[in-house]
Structure formats: C-alpha cells, structure tokens
Amino acid sequence: MAQVRARLSGVTKVFESGNGRVHALGPLDLDLGAGEFVTIVGPSGCGKTTLLETLAGLTAPTDGTVSFEGKPVGDEVPAGVGVVFQEDASFPWLNVWDNIAFGLRRAGVAAAEIRARVTYAIAFMGLQAFARAYPAQLSGGMRQRVCIARTLVLQPRLILLDEPFGALDQQTRLLMGDELLRLWRETHATVLLITHAIDEAVMLADRVGVMSARPGRFIELIETGWPASRSSAIVAEEAFGKLTAHVWSRLRGESLRALGRTEAEPAGSVS
C-alpha cells in the first residue's frame, strides 16, 4: 500500500438508547492509502455511515483511534477532508456558482482564488450552462454534481462519500461514477465511498470492504485489480461479473443475518 493517509485502529462505537446500549460498530481496523479508492458495502444498519462519520470527525469512537495524515481526528472535520452525503446539501437560496463558492468565502479565501477554483470546478463537473441556476431548477444528478464541485474547490486530500448517487437511476449512477473516477485520477485524492449497490462498489474501487451485520466489522477487503484508467465500460467484462458475484457471496449471509434469517429459512416463513 502507498503511504497511509487515514487510519482507524480498533474502532468501536456504542450508542446509548432508551432500550439500552447499541453496539453499532467494530472493533475494526482500516488503512486508506494515499491516492487509493476504497468502497464499502454491508447490510443495512451495519454501521457504514457511522464509520464514515467517525473518520470525518463528526462522531467520536467509543474505543480505538482515528487519524488523518498521522494526526488524531478530533470532534470536527479536519482540514483536508471533504464529505458528500446522499441528501441534497445545496442551499436553495444560492445559485450554483454561489453554492460552490460558499465554503471558500467562509474560509476567507481571496476573491481571485475563489473565481479560479469555482471556474475550474464548474467546468470539470460540466456545470457551465447552470452556473446561475438555482437548485430547484436542477435534476438530482445535477444537484449532486454541485455538491461534489463544492467539495472539489476545497482541494481535499481525503474525500468521504456516503451514498452520493443513491437517489439516482442506474444509468445516471454509472455516468456519475465515471465523473468521480475522473475527479479521483486528476486530484490524486484518497476516496472512501459507501454504497448499497454492489456493481457500483466493484466498478469504482481499488478495494471493496465487505462489512458484517451489526456490530459492523470487515469480513473481507477485496482487491479488484482494476487499472486507474477504468470506467463504467468494465461492467460488461467477464471479470467484473465474477468479482461482483464474489462480493455478493460474502455479503448475502450477513444481509440475511441482519434480517434475522438463515440461509435455509425462506422469506416469509413463520416460526
């Protein structure tokens, strides 16, 4: 692996609820190399989002340590880390240009630098025709392009994405995946993406992390072997089908366990 950019070591997360303690995550370990693209799949409720929020500094682990570029992650998103969620996070009262510039203005970046970065991000994400449009005038895919562009202008070295294309149709997801791969290649950022779509996870990743049912742990980290130049065209390759089938074979049992079922128990059976 290349130089480690982010690391989770022995991380667990326990939540207190009205019904007692909920062991949501871990213990688990994960190293993210500089310039690596890692995707994570797992059953619903296994702690995927909790893992991302822990790495981003949005929630503290109950046990274990989290670091970014060798420094402990505290209780806020570290400089150099960008986060994109599934939910539309654009500001409806700002047009596309001002949405993308928002974080730079808050950070006190000089006006000329803001213009240069926003102009580049808008061109990179294919938003030139929509720079003065408002979020309500855009499709879901275009709004996600705006959110990714808003992260891009901050020049993050680690990009964390939680189901960024979850609300999009399959064709748009594949095309957005191609855009994300292009962004990854050009910026050399480390990317961690959470998804429920196995084909998306396999297409995008250098490594696919498969998580267990709650409490979430890694049951396998799978090397894909794809070249950095990959695109959605690989979904038609035989190797892609085999790798996708392998990921599902590891995930299926955990998904059944999360539903309280076993391999031998058919759906709809009643005990």
Q: Which stretches of residues belong to each language-model region?
A:
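Conserved signature/switch motifs of ABC ATPase nucleotide-binding domains
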Residues: A133-A136, L154
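Helix-to-loop junction immediately C-terminal to a conserved catalytic motif
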Residues: A56
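Conserved ABC ATPase "signature" region
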Residues: R105, A112-F130, R182
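A short, flexible loop at the N-terminus of ABC-type nucleotide-binding domains that lies
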Residues: A2-R5, V14-P27
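Conserved ABC transporter NBD signature motif
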Residues: G64-E76
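The feature captures the beta-strand-to-loop junction immediately N-terminal to the Walker
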Residues: V41-P43
